[in-house]
């Protein structure tokens, strides 16, 4: 089971958003994540017209798009948001009980590594 290309999920997710909203999301990385420069979220978001409610709607629509695109995965999706070097990253992920399954899934989806929640570290995905 592989995550579909984000372009197949994100486009319907942004129905109803204006062209003004899309540049601040700057659509996405190829691994299923969204990157939003932190400067767009400072000072009431006047710089980008990106508002909290719109961000929540976008996250919910992307999550729901993946849930529809991958049968049986809806109950195992997680959404994460973190700040690194002035950029907020949003990513959809799924979890596994078995490390081998996680590594296989990561390999199938061209991931560099998987996160091990038990150790708090990452494990390289070897090709």
What label would you give each PLM region?
Residues 1-127:
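Conserved, structured core segments of small domains
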């Amino acid at each position: 089971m592989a995550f579909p290309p984000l372009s197949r999920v994100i486009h319907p997710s942004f129905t109803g958003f204006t062209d003004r909203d899309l540049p601040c999301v700057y659509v996405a990385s190829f691994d299923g994540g969204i990157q939003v420069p932190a400067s767009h979220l400072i000072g009431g978001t006047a710089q980008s017209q990106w508002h909290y409610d719109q961000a929540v709607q976008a996250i919910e629509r992307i999550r729901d798009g993946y849930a529809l695109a991958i049968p049986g995965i809806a109950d195992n999706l997680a959404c994460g948001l973190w700040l690194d070097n002035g950029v907020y990253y949003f990513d959809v992920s799924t979890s596994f009980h078995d490390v081998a399954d996680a590594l296989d899934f990561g390999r199938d989806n061209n991931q560099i590594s998987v996160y091990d929640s038990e150790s708090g570290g990452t494990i390289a995905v070897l090709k």
